[in-house]
C-alpha cells in the first residue's frame, strides 16, 4: 500500500508541474492586439436621425474607452447632440453621428454625473479629427475629449 501511495503522489506532482508549465506558457511577452470598438446596437439609439448618413453631412465618431475599473465599467454613458439625448454607450462601444458642418454641442453624462458638454467643430477638413473620446477620471467622473486620429 505505501508503494501505491508514493506513485499517486508522484503522478499528482507531475500533473501539477505540467499544469503550471502550461499556465506560464500562455503568458505572452507582448500585449494582445487591441480589440476594435463595437457599434451601439440600433435598439439603443433613441434619435436615429443623427446616425443616418446623408449628403453634406460629416461623420463624427464618439467612442467609450475601455476601462478595467469595476466602478465605471458597467455604467452607461448617455450621449447628447445639441441638447437631445441620442443614445448611451457601454464599455468599448462607439457611435457615428452624421452632422452638418459647424459647431455642435456633444455632451455625455451618467446617472451620477451632470452633463459634460464639448463645443465640437465639425468640418470636412482632413487637418481636423472628428473623433471624441468618453473616459472616466480617477474620481470616477465622466469626461469628454476631442482626440487625434
Segments the model singles out, each with a brief description of its role:
Residues 2, 27-149:
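Short loop/turn and low-complexity linker motifs enriched in small/turn-promoting residues
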Residues 8-10, 22, 28:
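Secreted/luminal cysteine- and crosslink-motif detector
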Residues 14-24:
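Bacterial N-terminal signal peptides
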Residues 2-16:
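Bacterial N-terminal signal peptides that target proteins for export
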Amino acid at each position: 500500500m505505501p508503494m501505491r501511495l508514493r506513485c499517486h503522489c508522484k503522478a499528482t506532482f507531475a500533473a501539477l508541474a505540467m499544469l503550471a508549465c502550461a499556465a506560464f506558457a500562455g503568458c505572452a511577452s507582448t500585449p494582445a492586439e487591441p480589440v476594435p470598438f463595437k457599434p451601439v446596437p440600433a435598439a439603443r439609439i433613441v434619435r436615429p436621425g443623427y446616425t443616418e448618413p446623408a449628403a453634406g453631412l460629416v461623420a463624427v465618431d464618439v467612442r467609450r474607452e475601455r476601462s478595467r475599473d469595476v466602478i465605471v465599467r458597467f455604467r452607461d454613458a448617455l450621449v447628447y447632440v445639441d441638447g437631445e439625448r441620442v443614445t448611451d454607450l457601454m464599455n468599448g462601444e462607439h457611435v457615428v453621428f452624421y452632422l452638418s458642418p459647424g459647431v455642435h454641442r456633444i455632451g455625455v453624462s451618467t446617472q451620477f454625473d451632470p452633463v459634460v458638454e464639448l463645443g465640437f467643430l465639425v468640418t470636412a477638413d482632413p487637418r481636423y479629427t472628428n473623433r471624441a473620446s468618453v473616459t472616466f477620471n480617477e474620481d470616477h467622473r465622466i469626461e469628454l475629449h476631442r482626440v487625434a486620429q
